[in-house]
């Protein structure tokens, strides 16, 4: 099973982002700077909707990535960050077992775009907001077979959408120093990935 949960915040002021996150998430009690890349390997699920463990880094000159341990859309958090920091916030989530993919863009306190699909059940796609200039008629990659046209919105689509905003969805964590925000009661149990045949974030 593979799960991906992340926020991307357009900012060059990482310290201001850290303070905004700490203010918005009362369960966060400790901030630890200059953590190595392998800190990103321990993102275990939170027991409640709000994350209580986050790691962030300035992985792009204009964008910070925040990995967190909540499989929640975090609408209030993303909207609040985009408003308080007067910027854009992108939320991405994916889950391989349920074949679930999520993308949302918040800008200056407004939800501008939201896409949500789950191919393992019959729920309808969420597709709200103005279509981006780079999108097809429907979100995702256009496929044609036997005269039939369909669209697949998956992990590759999430990566491509992020690139359109000027950053890579994934960068090698070992290339950066990370800031850890967590609840002091969080039980740390790092994963042993030395023998993994693929990166921790790739779930197929």
Predicted regions and their residues:
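Intrinsic-disorder-associated interaction segments
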Residues: 10, 14, 74, 151-154
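Short, extreme N-terminal segment that most often corresponds to the first beta-strand
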Residues: 1-29, 202-203
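Short, low-complexity intrinsically disordered segments
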Residues: 2, 61, 91, 176, ...
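Exposed alpha-helical structural elements
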Residues: 16, 73-80, 157-160
């Amino acid at each position: 099973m593979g799960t991906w949960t992340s926020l991307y915040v357009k900012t060059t002021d990482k310290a201001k982002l850290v303070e905004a996150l700490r203010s918005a998430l009362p369960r966060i009690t400790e901030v630890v700077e200059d953590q190595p890349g392998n800190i990103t390997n321990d993102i275990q699920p939170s027991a409640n909707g709000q994350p209580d463990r986050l790691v962030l880094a300035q992985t792009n000159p204009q964008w910070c990535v925040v990995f967190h341990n909540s499989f929640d859309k975090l609408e209030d958090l993303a909207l609040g960050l985009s408003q308080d920091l007067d910027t854009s916030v992108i939320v991405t989530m994916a889950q391989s077992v349920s074949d679930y993919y999520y993308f949302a863009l918040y800008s200056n306190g407004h939800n501008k775009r939201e896409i949500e699909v789950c191919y393992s059940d019959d729920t309808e796609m969420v597709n709200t907001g103005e279509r981006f200039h780079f999108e097809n008629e429907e979100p995702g990659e256009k496929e044609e077979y036997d005269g039939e046209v369909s669209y697949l919105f998956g992990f590759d689509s999430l990566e491509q959408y992020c690139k359109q905003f000027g950053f890579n969805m994934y960068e090698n964590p070992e290339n950066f120093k990370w800031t850890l925000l967590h609840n002091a009661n969080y039980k740390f149990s790092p994963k042993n990935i030395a023998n993994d045949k693929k990166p921790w974030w790739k779930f197929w």
